[in-house]
Design a protein with these regions (language model features):
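N-terminal module-boundary/linker segments of secreted carbohydrate-active enzymes
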Residues: 21-59
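An active-site-proximal structural segment forming one wall of the substrate-binding cleft
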Residues: 90-117, 131-162, 173-209, 229, ...
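Aromatic- and acidic-residue-enriched segments that line the glycan-binding/catalytic groove
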Residues: 60-75, 133-137, 165-182, 322-333, ...
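Hydrophobic faces of well-ordered beta-strands that scaffold small-molecule active sites
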Residues: 48-52, 117-119, 156-160, 208-210, ...
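Extracellular glycoside hydrolase catalytic/binding regions
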Residues: 206-207, 213-372
Length: 420
């Protein structure tokens, strides 16, 4: 999840490069024939999914209880393992992995009409590096999760969420702080992890997509290096019968149309949040909806399948530690990180830590309308994957509970929030 410290407007200037009917872009038809054994009808069948955020890659805001039991310097999975030591860290993480999401969650996902699950995992769980403090074990649970998905007719995108050196400096990369991905041997090490995922799991009947790396922070990276990494990653996976998924690197949802010629089965992943800059946080409900609907229309002009691989019902950044442990929220003026602060916009009461049931009726109605609009908007393109399925205390981000509360359209195909 794009959490924190890269302040970019949620509104991407969309260049309308081409127009085509919903479904498979004409420019992709011939390319897909080379990989004609894809396991999902991307484009013609809409992706409707959720992320299992916080399961195999810790995030303080998703499971604050895990971090509250540690000193305040523990801000990510790296410092969690480093501070506790491998024996204690493994004990706590084994308990978390085995209980946070279970087969019953996958059954419930299927029962409400979802057809896709994006499962984030860090390189350290796949191909650990000497000297890393991380502990292993999540990779085996990933294999079990794929079987659960298959049993419930769900397709899976395996998402390499954390790369060696950190590709964005966010806590959700495993290590908050400097961005050292692309330095030294980190690119080669990332390919090693991806190739192991390919060899172990690409042939699994439930695996329909593999994402090369989550949210590389393009403005802070050499984009020629990122593009070459994507090309080489595609080359490693091209015959694996999966959609080879790449994130837009915050370069703009329409910025990749001139890239990827001759590469089949490519899917672009774009993440749409309207909470990580003060301009977005000050928008009215109608402005939030208009922004999302316009973004979906921009997605639909791409010449590659484009999925909103992360999005949320939130219109505030109030959730405890959403921007990082100890950082605060822009919305209520408590944000303070690396010299950046914020001014008060509104109260975080009921949203800092709480439940869907505890939301005000106004919040209930507004979030419901925002979700309804985004679901329709993103289905103008390849579809959507909500962030995230569950969390401990962030009601705007809890798809399971939002659905139970009647705030997600049922059936999912009935979303119409951009139609009025």
């Amino acid at each position: 999840m794009f959490t924190s410290h890269f302040s970019a407007s949620a509104v991407t200037a969309a260049a309308i490069l081409s127009t085509f009917a919903n479904g498979l872009p004409t420019s992709l038809v011939s390319k897909v024939k080379r990989g004609d054994s894809l396991k999902f009808n991307f484009g013609s069948e809409k992706i409707r999914g959720v992320n299992t955020g916080g399961w195999f890659v810790l995030e303080p805001w998703i499971t604050p209880s895990i971090f509250e039991a540690t000193p305040s310097n523990v801000v990510d999975e790296y410092t969690f393992c480093q501070t506790l030591g491998k024996t204690e860290a493994e004990s706590r993480l084994q308990q978390h992995w085995s209980t946070w999401i279970t087969e019953s969650d996958f059954a419930e996902m299927a029962s409400i009409g979802l057809n896709f699950v994006r499962i984030p995992i860090g390189y350290w769980s796949v191909s650990p590096l000497p000297g890393d403090p991380y502990v292993q074990g999540a990779y085996e649970y990933l294999g079990e999760a794929l079987n659960w998905a298959q049993s419930n007719n769900l397709m899976v995108m395996i998402d390499l969420h954390g790369a060696p050196g950190s590709q964005n400096g966010f806590d959700n990369s495993g290590r908050r702080g400097p961005i050292d991905w692309t330095q030294g041997n980190t690119i080669a090490q990332t390919h090693t992890a991806l190739n192991k995922i390919r060899d172990d799991y690409a042939s699994h009947p439930a695996v329909a997509a593999i994402e090369l790396v989550n949210e590389p922070l393009g403005p802070d990276l050499d984009m020629d290096t990122v593009r070459q990494f994507y090309m080489d990653g595609w080359g490693d996976l091209e015959d694996s019968h999966v959609a080879i998924t790449f994130h837009d690197a915050f370069e703009g949802v329409n910025s990749w149309n001139d890239w990827g010629s001759g590469m089949w089965a490519l899917m672009e992943d774009t993440h749409h949040y309207e909470v990580f800059d003060s301009g977005s946080l000050q928008m009215s409900l109608s402005e939030h909806i208009s922004t999302a609907c316009s973004f979906g229309a921009s997605m639909a002009t791409n010449n590659k399948w484009t999925v909103a691989g992360e999005w949320t019902g939130a219109m505030t950044d109030c959730a405890q530690w959403l921007n990082g442990r100890g950082v605060g929220a822009r919305y209520d003026g408590t944000y303070n990180y690396n010299g950046e602060s914020s001014s008060y916009i509104g109260s975080c009461d009921g949203k800092y830590s709480g439940t869907v049931a505890g939301l005000s009726q106004a919040d209930h109605n507004n979030i419901k309308s925002f979700i309804n609009a985004q679901m329709q908007a993103f289905e103008d393109a390849a579809g959507w994957i909500f962030w995230c399925w569950k969390n401990e205390a962030a009601p705007e981000w809890h798809f399971q509970n939002l659905t139970a509360a009647g705030m997600v359209p049922q059936p999912l195909s009935s979303a119409n929030g951009c139609s009025s």
